[in-house]
């Protein structure tokens, strides 16, 4: 049914079902309101005066049909605007109200006031705020600080054909190359330069220390939204707009650099265990990659993401996709990762379809004639990257891009299961932030949104600038094309390399604990599993807690203190015997042992021999009985059921032989 919603900023029309709740109504309403609206102040009423107004959080669980609303009814909405919206992306600080009013879920739906944020990101629709002297106030990662101190020059040996100088001399043929040298990258078949090499390239053109000019941050993030607080003095958007506050036309080009150059999985077992649910059910699976960033020497000034664990959040797996549920313990998992020296580095999901040959091969769906990354997947990954910005002192906003990576497991052209790694470009992330693009039914095409709503009214929440892209036409000329209504998705992502180490040295060495949220395949995390890992009933001094999922489960038990949890994570990652003995002597660890001893460890089932199963019954008769034929191969069936079958057989005389 169609509901009309009248508010201070005009009339809106929403399409709902009677079984939909007011929470669903709020998810449709909030994106259509001005971005400065505080969702906590939204109220609904049947009267224009608002005498019986109810807050959205109070009626979020009620169905629309329960209130007597029908097709075409009019409801009145009131709300308040935030006094000031702060961006703060450089230092990672944001007020709670601004985050609530501007953050969407991973699937694009707005977050209601009564719901918790999955993580605490900077606002996605906040104004673009510049930071004064970011090189003094912004705290980078230790890896970026180390790479900033390196010159990144590529050494070359003496050319015996061209060099005419002595062994201690140097000329143009043997002098070190810059890390962004195009010829060197082409020879080494490096498609994209690293972000630190790109920084060296643009910094050499932006700042000239020899001229004595003031320093200008060379990195600039794209900004495709209407700027707030325009100095021209006109009313704020959407009441007014001018050339100073409106975004310029967008010209898309392939991004020449990438924030992360390589994705390294600590062991092949990480991927193998992640694929087990698909092998058992044929449904897809999604997981969050936890690891760390290290230097990557294959690419000049390169960075690689080392994956140590995959955590699978609550989800509903289907054959053609995944539906994410609320991840209630995300903060606990991130805290365990932090204590282990890890952080979320990416996301991974499967897109597999069994070839039906019985050899484990998969159908190749992603290739040059179809697509490599679908438009819907690009928008999903771009939102994740927007929630994990990278702080840097080389940008005037204190941030630039994101190190968050995206991995897809699918079948290749040889029918093998392979991994592909990607990152969304900075233009793609900002276009998703600004609500300029949306997925299309064609996975290889991205749509440019229209400013008009479905009812023909002009949108009050987004401004769509002109979008173009450059390509090589059939005559070999570099031409500019209009991106409306759709353009190829290849302009929105870059590819990464991936692999496994030659000598694996994983942080977590024990893979015997069940993985969370796998109850649908019969893999559940229980206290008995912890008792088995810790060998509680065996009274052993040796125990192996080096498992990420085990650490997360122990934290959920809320037995250990913060210091004891930090010590436990240190034992799991550093494998120090001194720390292990110190952990065993703590009060929390002894309490955990007492709980596990009271819970108990399940004893293994007693094996049975076939000779002792039916000592006094004719086996030739039992072998022809349909019940025994069905249970003949089930050796782990309880003995009581098998003897019950024997008693039933003894009460029934054998059938007479057929007449000859």
Curated annotation (Swiss-Prot):
InterPro entries in the record: MPN, Npl4, NPL4_C, NPL4_Zn-bd_put, Ubiquitin-like_domsf
Disordered: annotated span: 621-660
Domain MPN: 263-400
One Pfam family from the record: NPL4
Keyword Cytoplasm: yes
A molecular-function term among this protein's GO annotations: ubiquitin protein ligase binding
GO cellular component, one term: nuclear membrane
Gene3D superfamilies: Cytidine Deaminase, domain 2, Phosphatidylinositol 3-kinase Catalytic Subunit, Chain A, domain 1
Protein name: Nuclear protein localization protein 4
Taxonomic source organism: Neurospora crassa (strain ATCC 24698 / 74-OR23-1A / CBS 708.71 / DSM 1257 / FGSC 987)
């Amino acid at each position: 049914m169609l509901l009309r919603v009248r508010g201070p900023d005009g009339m809106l029309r929403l399409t709902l079902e009677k079984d939909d709740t007011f929470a669903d109504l709020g998810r449709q309403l909030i994106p259509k309101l001005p971005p400065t609206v505080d969702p906590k102040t939204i109220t609904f009423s049947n009267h224009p005066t608002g005498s019986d107004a109810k807050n959205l959080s109070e009626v979020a669980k009620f169905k629309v049909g329960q209130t007597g609303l029908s097709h075409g009814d009019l409801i009145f909405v009131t709300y308040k605007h935030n006094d000031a919206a702060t961006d703060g992306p450089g230092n990672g600080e944001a007020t709670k109200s601004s985050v609530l009013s501007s953050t969407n879920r991973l699937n694009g739906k707005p977050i209601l006031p009564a719901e918790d944020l999955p993580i605490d990101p900077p606002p996605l629709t906040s104004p673009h705020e510049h930071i004064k002297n970011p090189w003094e106030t912004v705290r980078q990662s230790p890896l970026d600080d180390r790479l900033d101190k390196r010159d990144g020059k590529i050494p070359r040996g003496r050319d015996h054909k061209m060099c005419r100088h002595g062994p201690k001399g140097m000329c143009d043929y043997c002098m070190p190359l810059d890390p962004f040298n195009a010829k060197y990258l082409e020879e080494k078949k490096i498609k994209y330069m690293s972000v630190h090499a790109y920084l060296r390239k643009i910094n050499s053109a932006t700042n000239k220390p020899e001229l004595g000019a003031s320093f200008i941050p060379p990195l600039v993030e794209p900004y495709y939204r209407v700027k707030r607080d325009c100095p021209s003095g006109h009313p704020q958007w959407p009441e007014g707009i001018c050339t100073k506050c409106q975004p310029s036309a967008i010209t898309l080009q392939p991004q020449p650099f990438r924030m992360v150059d390589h994705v390294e999985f600590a062991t092949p077992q990480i991927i193998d265990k992640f694929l087990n649910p698909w092998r058992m059910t044929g449904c897809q699976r999604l997981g969050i990659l936890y690891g760390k960033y290290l230097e990557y020497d294959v690419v000049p000034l390169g960075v690689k993401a080392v994956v140590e664990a995959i955590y699978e959040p609550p989800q509903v797996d289907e054959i053609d996709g995944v539906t994410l549920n609320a991840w209630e313990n995300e903060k606990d998992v991130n805290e365990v990762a932090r204590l282990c020296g890890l952080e979320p580095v990416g996301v991974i999901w499967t897109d597999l379809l069994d070839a039906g040959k019985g050899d484990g091969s998969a159908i190749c769906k992603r290739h040059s004639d179809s697509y490599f990354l679908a438009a819907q997947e690009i928008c999903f990954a771009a939102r994740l990257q927007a929630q994990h910005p990278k702080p840097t002192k080389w940008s005037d906003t204190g941030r630039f891009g994101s190190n968050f990576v995206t991995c897809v497991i699918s079948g290749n052209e040889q029918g093998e299961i392979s991994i592909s790694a990607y990152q969304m470009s900075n233009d793609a992330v900002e276009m998703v932030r600004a609500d300029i693009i949306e997925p299309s039914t064609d996975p290889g095409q991205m749509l440019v949104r229209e400013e008009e709503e479905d009812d023909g009214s002009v949108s009050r929440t987004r401004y769509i600038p002109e979008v173009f892209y450059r390509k090589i036409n059939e005559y070999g000329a570099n031409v500019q094309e209009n991106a409306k209504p759709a353009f190829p998705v290849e302009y929105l992502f870059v590819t990464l390399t991936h692999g496994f180490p030659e000598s694996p040295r994983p942080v977590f060495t024990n893979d015997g604990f069940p993985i969370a949220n796998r109850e649908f395949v019969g893999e559940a995390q229980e206290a008995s599993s912890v008792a088995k890992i810790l060998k509680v009933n065996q009274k052993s001094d040796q125990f192996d807690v080096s498992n990420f999922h085990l650490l997360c489960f122990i934290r959920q038990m809320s037995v250990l203190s913060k210091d004891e949890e930090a010590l436990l994570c240190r034992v799991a990652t550093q494998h120090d015997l001194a720390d292990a003995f110190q952990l065993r002597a703590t009060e929390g660890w002894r309490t955990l042992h007492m709980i596990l001893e009271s819970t108990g460890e399940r004893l293994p089932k007693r094996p049975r021999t076939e000779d002792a199963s039916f000592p006094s019954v004719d086996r030739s008769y039992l072998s022809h009985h349909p019940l025994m034929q069905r249970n003949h191969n089930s050796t782990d069936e309880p003995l009581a059921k098998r003897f019950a079958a024997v008693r039933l057989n003894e009460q029934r005389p054998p059938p007479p032989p057929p007449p000859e």
